[in-house]
Amino acid sequence: MNAAGGGSGAQAAGVAAGNISLSHNALLSTASGATTMPMAQLADGWLELESDPGLFTLLLKDFGCHDVQVEEVYDLQKPIESPYGFIFLFRWIEERRARRKIVETTAEIFVKDEEAISSIFFAQQVVPNSCATHALLSVLLNCNENNLQLGDTLSRLKTHTKGMSPENKGLAIGNTPELACAHNSHAMPQARRRLERTGAGVSSCRFTGEAFHFVSFVPINGQLFELDGLKPYPMNHGGWEDSEDWTDKFRRVMAERLGIATGEQDIRFNLMAVVPDRRIAITHKLKMLRTNQAIVSGTLQKLLKADEQGESGNGDSQRPDTPTTLLEPSAFTARDLQSLLKNLDTEIAINEQHLTDENDRRHMFKVDASRRTHNYDKFICTFLSMLAHQGVLGELVSQHLLPSKKVSGQGAANRISKQSNTASAGGSTTGASASTPKTQQQQAAAAKNGKSPSKTPGRRRKGRNKCRKRK
């Protein structure tokens, strides 16, 4: 379905843009100017993205949501701390029979009540190649705003699309300039060339036989929802026990889903979790540890000073009072406080290293993004042109072609050798009929003269050696 044109699409575009007046032929670009597109082709110009947690983390930051990150999940049984939701990506070679079974399995849990659908953020994917952004928004816009700062763009989108149909919500996403430009700024140059070659009507997330597709799993009002932009309705997998976390319910659903899929078709998948920025929790823990360190250190100094005054004969000295109720001087000796202070120093060093590792990861996310989005075509063409101008390009090409020719020649020789070995082995099993004509003539002449057939040189030498030993 094309998002361009139509009353609902124009209305959604105006609402999502926050009533910003834009020219029909205006060019939209990111802050760096790396991505530009005509306004008329906004919904048709979305590019395909890779499934990478670093890319998704930077994309969330570009959306204006700074306190969130995306992590890849390698083990379903490993506990994950405070996830907002999960994004399930699978590469799927579609088959009608397997597709029908999955549809029949999920059709029973469709939520078709319009009031229930409008109370959550569920958007149908009506814009090609926008499935990555759809999956992220399906998680973020269904979270409690008290626990998550969405930023201006996402907050405005959530407010203005409240009460819209899933189709119009999908159109609003596709026609939001900030989202489109942020999305395309992380695409590889090959994705743009592929879009220009195939046209905007083809989506790797929707229309091809072999497709990458994103599905979101989010807890909403005590129920586990599966939000798939290619399905007509959201899916409710039900609640979980009071003694369980919602992730336990998710694990069971995923185990069942993977069992169905792998039993019917070839499926390759990965799983990502949308979680709070780990640096926030580490920074908060470091602040608490340093506060405790200061308290323990101050108490220890006062205790040592009091002990020194007591040893000097000052009977009026009293044991120091601690500034908080964290430590009671009567309950700890100087040795206990020194041991506690050492443990705090170790914990601080460990968490400082964790914070450094997280910052290094963010830096590598940016480095990988620069390498991913950079267009190397000009460099490669210039490099090859310089080699050709210097007259060494042909020689380099021939050098790289010669090994392949040698390998192919060796392969042919090996095949011929195997065939000859097979023929000789087969001939040796036929007994006397395998003797050569020359050998048959020698044996006939020896029999005619009344002599035994001549021995081979090896046997002749062996007989001479035996005679020498007897002598």
From Swiss-Prot:
One of its GO terms (molecular function) is cysteine-type deubiquitinase activity. Residues 375-403 form the ULD domain. One of its GO terms (cellular component) is chromatin. The record marks 228 as: Important for enzyme activity. The active site is at residues 131, 213. Coiled coil: none annotated. Residues 457-471 have a biased composition (Basic residues). Residues 422-447 have a biased composition (Low complexity). Residues 314-326 have a biased composition (Polar residues). It comes from the Eukaryota. SUPFAM superfamilies: Cysteine proteinases. GO terms for biological process: epigenetic regulation of gene expression; heterochromatin formation; protein deubiquitination; specification of segmental identity, abdomen; ubiquitin-dependent protein catabolic process. It catalyses: Thiol-dependent hydrolysis of ester, thioester, amide, peptide and isopeptide bonds formed by the C-terminal Gly of ubiquitin (a 76-residue protein attached to proteins as an intracellular targeting signal). It holds the Pfam family UCH_C. Catalytic component of the polycomb repressive deubiquitinase (PR-DUB) complex, a complex that specifically mediates deubiquitination of histone H2A monoubiquitinated at 'Lys-119' (H2AK118ub1). Mediates bisymmetric organization of the PR-DUB complex and is involved in association with nucleosomes to mediate deubiquitination. Does not deubiquitinate monoubiquitinated histone H2B. Required to maintain the transcriptionally repressive state of homeotic genes throughout development. The PR-DUB complex has weak or no activity toward 'Lys-48'- and 'Lys-63'-linked polyubiquitin chains. This is Ubiquitin carboxyl-terminal hydrolase calypso. The gene is caly.
